[in-house]
Protein backbone atom coordinates (compact mmCIF):
# COMPACT_ATOMS: atom_id res chain seq x y z
CA UNK A 1 0.00 0.00 0.00
CA UNK A 2 1.52 3.11 -1.00
CA UNK A 3 2.69 5.37 1.92
CA UNK A 4 2.53 9.15 2.25
CA UNK A 5 5.81 11.02 2.52
CA UNK A 6 6.17 14.63 3.62
CA UNK A 7 9.36 16.46 2.76
CA UNK A 8 10.43 19.54 4.65
CA UNK A 9 12.91 21.67 2.77
CA UNK A 10 14.87 24.32 4.68
CA UNK A 11 16.53 26.98 2.59
CA UNK A 12 19.42 28.83 4.39
CA UNK A 13 20.92 32.09 3.13
CA UNK A 14 24.09 31.84 1.08
CA UNK A 15 27.36 32.18 3.04
CA UNK A 16 28.75 35.71 3.25
CA UNK A 17 32.32 36.30 2.01
CA UNK A 18 34.81 36.78 4.84
CA UNK A 19 37.77 39.20 4.71
CA UNK A 20 40.79 38.65 6.92
CA UNK A 21 43.23 41.49 7.86
CA UNK A 22 46.23 41.40 10.09
CA UNK A 23 46.41 43.57 13.27
CA UNK A 24 49.29 45.57 11.80
CA UNK A 25 47.19 46.59 8.83
CA UNK A 26 44.41 47.87 11.05
CA UNK A 27 46.84 50.24 12.93
CA UNK A 28 48.31 51.91 9.90
CA UNK A 29 47.45 55.62 9.63
CA UNK A 30 45.23 56.70 6.93
CA UNK A 31 47.20 59.92 6.21
CA UNK A 32 50.40 59.70 4.25
CA UNK A 33 52.98 62.47 5.12
CA UNK A 34 53.97 64.78 2.32
CA UNK A 35 57.64 64.57 1.39
CA UNK A 36 59.61 67.73 0.51
CA UNK A 37 61.61 67.69 -2.67
CA UNK A 38 65.38 67.46 -2.08
CA UNK A 39 67.35 70.77 -1.96
CA UNK A 40 69.31 71.01 -5.18
CA UNK A 41 72.06 73.06 -3.40
CA UNK A 42 74.96 71.06 -2.00
CA UNK A 43 76.68 71.81 1.32
CA UNK A 44 80.45 72.16 1.17
CA UNK A 45 82.78 72.01 4.18
CA UNK A 46 86.02 74.03 3.99
CA UNK A 47 88.65 73.99 6.76
CA UNK A 48 90.45 77.15 7.87
CA UNK A 49 93.92 75.87 7.02
CA UNK A 50 92.84 75.46 3.38
CA UNK A 51 92.30 79.25 3.31
CA UNK A 52 95.63 79.99 4.94
CA UNK A 53 94.12 80.68 8.36
CA UNK A 54 95.09 79.23 11.72
CA UNK A 55 93.12 76.29 13.04
CA UNK A 56 93.38 77.56 16.62
CA UNK A 57 93.40 80.94 18.38
CA UNK A 58 95.59 81.22 21.48
CA UNK A 59 95.27 83.93 24.14
CA UNK A 60 97.72 84.12 27.03
CA UNK A 61 96.59 85.28 30.47
CA UNK A 62 98.93 86.42 33.21
CA UNK A 63 98.53 85.54 36.86
CA UNK A 64 97.61 89.14 37.62
CA UNK A 65 94.57 88.78 35.34
CA UNK A 66 93.13 86.13 37.64
CA UNK A 67 94.32 87.64 40.93
CA UNK A 68 92.85 91.13 40.43
CA UNK A 69 89.17 91.70 40.95
CA UNK A 70 87.40 93.09 37.87
CA UNK A 71 85.79 95.85 39.93
CA UNK A 72 89.13 96.97 41.33
CA UNK A 73 90.58 97.14 37.83
CA UNK A 74 87.61 99.16 36.60
CA UNK A 75 87.92 101.66 39.45
CA UNK A 76 91.64 102.01 38.84
CA UNK A 77 90.96 102.81 35.20
CA UNK A 78 88.48 105.51 36.17
CA UNK A 79 90.95 107.07 38.60
CA UNK A 80 93.57 107.16 35.87
CA UNK A 81 91.21 109.24 33.71
CA UNK A 82 90.67 111.80 36.46
CA UNK A 83 92.73 114.97 35.90
CA UNK A 84 95.23 115.64 38.66
CA UNK A 85 96.31 119.12 39.68
CA UNK A 86 100.06 119.63 40.00
CA UNK A 87 101.29 120.94 43.36
CA UNK A 88 102.85 124.39 43.55
CA UNK A 89 106.23 124.92 45.22
CA UNK A 90 107.76 128.09 46.62
CA UNK A 91 111.44 128.88 47.10
CA UNK A 92 112.47 129.79 50.65
CA UNK A 93 115.23 132.14 49.46
CA UNK A 94 115.57 135.17 47.24
CA UNK A 95 117.34 135.01 43.87
CA UNK A 96 121.08 135.18 44.59
CA UNK A 97 121.75 137.78 41.90
CA UNK A 98 119.13 140.10 43.42
CA UNK A 99 121.94 141.40 45.63
CA UNK A 100 124.62 141.47 42.98
CA UNK A 101 127.32 142.83 45.28
CA UNK A 102 126.87 139.99 47.76
CA UNK A 103 126.72 137.50 44.91
CA UNK A 104 130.09 138.65 43.51
CA UNK A 105 131.64 138.69 46.97
CA UNK A 106 130.56 135.12 47.66
CA UNK A 107 131.78 133.93 44.26
CA UNK A 108 135.19 135.45 44.97
CA UNK A 109 135.39 134.06 48.49
CA UNK A 110 133.83 130.57 48.06
CA UNK A 111 134.63 130.07 44.35
CA UNK A 112 131.09 128.74 43.80
CA UNK A 113 127.66 130.38 44.01
CA UNK A 114 124.10 129.68 42.97
CA UNK A 115 123.34 132.08 40.13
CA UNK A 116 119.72 131.52 39.08
CA UNK A 117 116.96 129.24 40.34
CA UNK A 118 113.25 128.79 39.56
CA UNK A 119 110.51 126.20 39.96
CA UNK A 120 109.40 124.76 36.62
CA UNK A 121 106.48 122.38 37.09
CA UNK A 122 107.69 119.29 38.93
CA UNK A 123 111.35 120.35 38.90
CA UNK A 124 113.71 123.08 40.00
CA UNK A 125 116.01 124.48 37.30
CA UNK A 126 118.91 126.84 37.68
CA UNK A 127 122.54 127.72 37.02
CA UNK A 128 125.69 127.74 39.13
CA UNK A 129 128.68 130.04 38.63
CA UNK A 130 132.19 128.90 39.64
CA UNK A 131 135.65 130.44 39.53
CA UNK A 132 137.92 128.92 36.93
CA UNK A 133 140.82 127.74 39.08
CA UNK A 134 141.60 124.62 37.04
CA UNK A 135 140.82 122.88 33.79
CA UNK A 136 139.21 119.73 35.15
CA UNK A 137 136.18 120.55 37.27
CA UNK A 138 132.90 119.03 38.41
CA UNK A 139 129.76 120.55 39.95
CA UNK A 140 127.04 118.55 41.71
CA UNK A 141 123.86 119.28 43.65
CA UNK A 142 123.45 117.42 46.93
CA UNK A 143 119.68 117.01 47.38
CA UNK A 144 117.48 115.67 50.18
CA UNK A 145 113.70 115.19 50.24
CA UNK A 146 113.37 113.76 53.78
CA UNK A 147 115.31 116.04 56.12
CA UNK A 148 118.70 114.53 55.24
CA UNK A 149 117.79 110.99 56.23
CA UNK A 150 118.83 110.30 52.63
CA UNK A 151 120.56 112.46 50.06
CA UNK A 152 121.41 112.25 46.37
CA UNK A 153 124.15 113.84 44.27
CA UNK A 154 122.88 115.29 41.01
CA UNK A 155 125.57 116.17 38.42
CA UNK A 156 125.35 119.56 36.72
CA UNK A 157 125.96 120.24 33.03
CA UNK A 158 128.68 122.56 31.77
CA UNK A 159 127.46 125.57 29.78
CA UNK A 160 129.74 126.98 27.12
CA UNK A 161 129.54 130.79 27.15
CA UNK A 162 131.58 132.84 24.68
CA UNK A 163 130.40 136.20 26.05
CA UNK A 164 132.34 135.94 29.29
CA UNK A 165 136.02 135.85 30.02
CA UNK A 166 137.93 132.84 31.19
CA UNK A 167 137.80 133.61 34.94
CA UNK A 168 134.41 131.92 35.57
CA UNK A 169 132.38 129.01 34.23
CA UNK A 170 128.66 128.24 34.37
CA UNK A 171 126.83 124.96 34.98
CA UNK A 172 123.12 124.16 34.71
CA UNK A 173 120.97 121.74 36.71
CA UNK A 174 117.43 120.39 36.79
CA UNK A 175 116.37 118.87 40.11
CA UNK A 176 113.22 116.71 39.94
CA UNK A 177 110.47 116.95 42.55
CA UNK A 178 109.05 113.43 42.97
CA UNK A 179 105.35 112.85 43.62
CA UNK A 180 104.58 113.42 47.29
CA UNK A 181 107.45 115.86 47.89
CA UNK A 182 106.50 118.42 50.55
CA UNK A 183 109.91 119.97 51.21
CA UNK A 184 113.30 119.73 49.56
CA UNK A 185 116.74 121.05 50.34
CA UNK A 186 119.97 121.26 48.39
CA UNK A 187 123.48 122.65 48.43
CA UNK A 188 126.20 122.88 45.78
CA UNK A 189 129.57 121.16 45.64
CA UNK A 190 132.34 122.38 43.32
CA UNK A 191 135.29 120.05 42.79
CA UNK A 192 138.42 121.31 41.03
CA UNK A 193 142.13 120.53 41.25
CA UNK A 194 141.55 117.95 43.98
CA UNK A 195 139.68 120.39 46.25
CA UNK A 196 135.99 120.74 47.22
CA UNK A 197 134.17 124.06 47.59
CA UNK A 198 130.61 124.38 48.92
CA UNK A 199 127.75 126.83 48.60
CA UNK A 200 125.22 126.09 51.36
CA UNK A 201 123.49 129.48 51.55
CA UNK A 202 125.55 130.54 54.58
CA UNK A 203 124.72 127.40 56.57
CA UNK A 204 120.98 127.33 55.84
CA UNK A 205 121.05 125.36 52.57
CA UNK A 206 118.71 126.22 49.72
CA UNK A 207 115.20 124.95 50.41
CA UNK A 208 111.69 125.00 48.98
CA UNK A 209 108.30 123.82 50.19
CA UNK A 210 104.93 122.87 48.77
CA UNK A 211 102.31 125.56 49.23
CA UNK A 212 100.09 124.85 52.22
CA UNK A 213 102.82 123.04 54.16
CA UNK A 214 104.42 126.14 55.65
CA UNK A 215 107.79 127.73 55.20
CA UNK A 216 110.80 126.48 57.10
CA UNK A 217 114.23 125.01 56.82
CA UNK A 218 114.85 121.31 57.24
CA UNK A 219 117.22 120.36 60.02
CA UNK A 220 120.23 118.50 58.74
CA UNK A 221 123.93 118.61 57.99
CA UNK A 222 125.42 121.58 56.20
CA UNK A 223 128.52 121.46 54.04
From Swiss-Prot:
Keywords: Carbohydrate metabolism, Glycogen metabolism
Family matches, as Pfam families: CBM_21
Keyword RNA-binding attached: no
All residue ranges annotated as the CBM21 domain in the record: 104-209
Keyword Nucleus on entry: no
GO biological process: glycogen metabolic process
Superkingdom of this protein's organism: Eukaryota
Domain remark from Swiss-Prot or TrEMBL: The N-terminal region is required for binding to PP1, the central region is required for binding to glycogen and the C-terminal region is required for binding to glycogen phosphorylase, glycogen synthase and phosphorylase kinase.
Subunit structure: Interacts with PPP1CC catalytic subunit of PP1 and associates with glycogen. Forms complexes with glycogen phosphorylase, glycogen synthase and phosphorylase kinase which is necessary for its regulation of PP1 activity.
Function: Acts as a glycogen-targeting subunit for PP1 and regulates its activity. Activates glycogen synthase, reduces glycogen phosphorylase activity and limits glycogen breakdown.
Protein name: Protein phosphatase 1 regulatory subunit 3C
Organism this protein belongs to: Xenopus tropicalis
Organism classification: Eukaryota, Metazoa, Chordata, Craniata, Vertebrata
